[in-house]
Structure formats: structure tokens, C-alpha cells
Amino acid sequence: TLLNVHGIDQITAAIKIVFASLYNDRAIAYRVHQKFPHDKVSLSAGIQKMVRSDLGASGVMFTLDTESGFRDAIFITAAYGLGETIVQGTVNPDEFYVYKRGLTLGYPAILSRRLGTKAIEMVYGDKKSTNDTFTLTRNVDVERRMRFSLSDTQVEALARQAMIIEQHYGHPMDIEWALDGLDKQLY
């Protein structure tokens, strides 16, 4: 994932980086281990407008409890800034468990919430960082760290979307999401 890419020159360079990733050590080792022919692999590069989660929050949600496999709960993680810190495991996020049936019936459905330390956040940067993106990681001030990064209303809205996505695909899902800090919408 290459974030905060601007203009045709940066987009062209980013696409080249994505295509070159087909031939990095990890990709080659994976194909060898899976006995997948190198000449049969395909790759595409998706380009989309950046959600301004650097001014909001982001995270990952699972349509089951990842520890127990319990399928009647949705597990949501959330932290400030771009989602890469959660995906990479470099931040201790807030965690929420939502009961699907309670949500469906219109009851308060948040089973538990745990305040993460959220010590760092990834935001847009002006210069290319070491991971080929225009981002930087910075400390989160103590006042923000002591607050949940999502309201209960936002947690339940995410959980509703997770249930719709799971129903569409017919099996448990792992879903990345973002809260735009400008328009306050969940994506």
C-alpha cells in the first residue's frame, strides 16, 4: 500500500513499485512454497482518493471474535491516523466487541470496549519516507490517547456495515475501514 501519492509522476512511480513487488524476496518465496508458477501470476494496481483518516481514525474489523471464533460478535480495532499502524502492528489500538443479535434487534450492542494506548499515529507527510510513501509517524498527545478514537454511535455504524458485508460474501470477513476527519464519514 502506497499512501498520500499526488500527481501523475508520483502515481507512475508508485505503480512501478507495486509491479516490482511481484519480484521481491517474499513474493518469490511465497510462490515457490505454494508451487505457483512465476509466469502465471497476475497483479493490478488500484488507485483511489485518499480518505483523510490522518485527521480522523482508522482500523480493522472482523465479523467474528478472532480469539475464539465466536461468530455472533464483531471485533473492531481503532486508532488515530492512517490504518497502516494497525495493519503493521505498531500501535496498541482501542478494541470494541459488538453483539450482532443485539444490534439487529436495536438494543445497545457494544459488549466491551478497551482503551488502547494509541501512542503513535501515521499522518500525511511532505517528503517521501523510507517505505516509499508520503507519510510520517508521530506521537499522539496524552489527552487524545486517554479518549476512545470512536464514539459508540460510530462503533455501531461500523458493525452494521460489517454485518452487511459478511452477509453479501457469505462468510466471516476482515475489513479495513477509515473515518475521514474532514467530512466525518466512515468508509
Regions found by a protein language model. Give the residues of each.
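Nucleotide/phosphate-binding sheet-loop regions of phosphoryl- and nucleotidyl-transfer enzymes
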Residues: 1-187
